[in-house]
A protein has these predicted regions:
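Active-site segments of SGNH/GDSL-like serine hydrolases
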Residues: 96-102, 128-157
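Conserved SGNH/GDSL esterase-like catalytic core that processes O-acyl groups on lipids
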Residues: 25-29, 35-119, 194
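Hydrophobic membrane-insertion alpha-helices, especially the h-region
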Residues: 5-17
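Conserved beta-strand segments of alpha/beta enzyme cores
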Residues: 52-53, 138, 170-172
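Sec-dependent signal peptide cleavage junction
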Residues: 17-24
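Catalytic His-Asp segment of secreted/periplasmic serine-dependent ester chemistry enzymes
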Residues: 145-214
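Extracytoplasmic/secreted proteins, especially bacterial periplasmic and envelope-associated proteins
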Residues: 30, 49, 63, 112-115, ...
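Short hydrophobic segments within beta-strands
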Residues: 31-32, 142
Length: 214
């Protein structure tokens, strides 16, 4: 009996020490347009490794699909690293993609806009199917927000469709439209969807709440 108690004590002691000393920090990969690349998230204490090498303010959904499909390589610290390697070696994945797609169409013309949105959604599903080949503690897809004084129905439809396919893969869809819609205090300027520091800070708070327990 004493041996059993001693073994139990040793086990509990080891378990406690492990939990106290275990590294709780996370590695985070952000890909897509500039909305995903959040300076406040980068400097947060729960993230010890932050990679933003596949961020480009001009990326569209098809760009990311092709980058992953053809396993594009970039140079990091004088070494070539493929997108597949980065996708394999991170705890958290954050994606923001499609803002360029939708605003390009709105600024061009709105003819057949719902067909265009459905094509966006289909492309996003192709992208998420590629992402689903990898394992993460958390995948967050950043939703779309309306900076115009119109098109509310379009953004409602777009977010609804994107959230449905995100849920299909059991990923988290970050709905920002209610927070950022027609709110110039979060934007660099009212004619562009790019965020200012206040906007990034607001989004980082939401994301940290969603990943802090991993």
């Amino acid at each position: 009996m004493k041996k059993i108690i001693l073994l139990l004590f040793l086990f509990l002691s080891c378990y406690l020490i492990y939990n106290l000393t275990e590294d709780k920090s996370l590695s985070c990969l952000v890909i897509g347009d500039k909305i995903a690349d959040n300076p406040y998230l980068k400097n947060n204490t729960i993230i010890n490794k932050y990679n933003n090498n596949y961020i480009n303010q001009d990326y569209r959904i098809t760009d990311l699909i092709n980058i992953i499909k053809y396993n594009e390589e970039i140079e990091i610290n004088n070494k070539k690293i493929s997108i597949h390697r980065l996708l394999k070696n991170n705890d958290i994945l954050i994606i923001s993609i499609g803002m360029n797609d939708i605003y390009y169409k709105l600024n061009d013309n709105t003819k057949n806009i719902y067909t265009y949105i459905n094509d966006m959604v289909n492309n996003m599903e192709i992208l998420l199917n590629e992402i689903n080949k990898y394992t993460y503690k958390k995948v967050i897809i950043i939703g779309y927000y309306n900076i115009t004084n119109k098109h509310n129905d379009l953004f409602t439809y777009l977010n609804y469709k994107m959230k449905r396919i995100t849920n299909k893969y059991h990923y988290e869809y970050l709905e920002l439209n209610d927070i950022l819609k027609n709110n110039p205090s979060y934007l660099q300027n009212s004619n562009n969807f790019n965020l200012n520091n206040q906007g990034y800070n607001e989004i980082s708070k939401i994301i940290v709440e969603k990943i802090k327990n991993y």
